[in-house]
């Protein structure tokens, strides 16, 4: 497995590997890897001839009051996991490599479509500008045929899909299913922040989504009633940023589920912010 910190070297590797029509799959991460990330790697290896993973904790997607400095960076463990998974190349740039002159002086950015405005966009106003910008940069640094993203960060997935569509980027976005712990908690790098008590309380998130999905499958297509069901099950959380049922494509509120929708949750358990979702597919 090769590791690169230089954009030029990473780009050259991708160009060399793509000769003869070979395909490259990119798995962008911020490190602190778990089985959810590895599921993306496995999908990339299955679908493409070559697989490259990036590890970069992007400073521009963290607000001043968020956990950039505390974000876990177990780089040796991450590299061992990727090596065992059969990744061929890992791109690990510094912030200076990605943002010459520093992130604070970086004047050019990607402003995403309206799908970024609700939900996370309300609670983390600059977050998706940072996400869209760094993903665009990663697409340039590691030119690939497909990029693999998890559905757990569903709004992020929508933002990136819209960016690729609207800017005619020559890359296919491949959504991959949420990977869960045996007890139902969605895998997240932030789960390691939870105490044993908080970990148990966090199980209410997936349980609330299970209840919403069950009610939907039994014929309840009223978003407000489904949101009430979610709220009733989220009381073990310390706070709830949102627990909503919205249109799957626009992420905007709806009065009735007549086409595919999604239930999305963002909560805090202790000081740890956790998100999850469940798609509600109209038969």
Swiss-Prot record:
Active-site residues, record numbering mapped to chain: 37 (proton donor)
Cellular component annotations (GO), alphabetically ordered: cytosol
GO biological process: pantothenate biosynthetic process
Reactions catalysed, as given in the entry: (R)-pantoate + beta-alanine + ATP = (R)-pantothenate + AMP + diphosphate + H(+)
Compartments it resides in: Cytoplasm
Family statement: Belongs to the pantothenate synthetase family.
Protein name (record): Pantothenate synthetase
Organism: Rhodopirellula baltica (strain DSM 10527 / NCIMB 13988 / SH1)
């Amino acid at each position: 497995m090769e590791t690169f910190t230089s954009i030029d070297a990473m780009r050259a590797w991708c160009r060399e590997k793509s000769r003869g029509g070979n395909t490259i799959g990119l798995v962008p991460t911020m490190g602190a890897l778990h089985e959810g990330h590895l599921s993306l790697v496995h999908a990339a290896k299955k679908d493409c001839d070559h697989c490259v993973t990036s590890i970069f904790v992007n400073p521009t997607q963290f607000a001043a009051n968020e956990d950039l400095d505390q974000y876990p960076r177990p780089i040796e463990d991450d590299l061992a996991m990727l090596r065992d998974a059969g990744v061929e190349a890992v791109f690990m740039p510094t912030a200076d490599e990605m943002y010459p002159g520093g992130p604070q002086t970086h004047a050019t950015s990607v402003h995403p479509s309206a799908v970024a405005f609700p939900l996370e966009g309300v609670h983390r106003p600059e977050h998706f500008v940072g996400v869209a910008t760094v993903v665009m940069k990663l697409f340039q640094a590691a030119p690939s045929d497909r990029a693999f993203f998890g559905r757990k960060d569903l709004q992020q997935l929508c933002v990136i899909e819209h960016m690729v569509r609207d800017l005619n980027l020559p890359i296919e976005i491949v959504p991959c299913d949420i990977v869960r712990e045996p007890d139902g908690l969605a895998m997240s790098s932030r789960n390691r922040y939870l105490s044993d008590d908080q970990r148990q309380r966090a199980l209410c998130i997936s349980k609330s989504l299970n209840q919403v999905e069950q009610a939907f499958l039994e014929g309840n297509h009223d978003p407000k009633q489904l949101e009430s069901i979610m709220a009733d099950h989220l009381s073990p959380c310390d706070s709830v940023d949102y627990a909503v049922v919205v249109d799957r494509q626009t992420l905007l509120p709806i009065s009735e589920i007549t086409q595919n929708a999604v239930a999305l949750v963002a909560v805090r358990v202790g000081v740890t912010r956790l998100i999850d979702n469940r798609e509600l597919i109209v038969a």
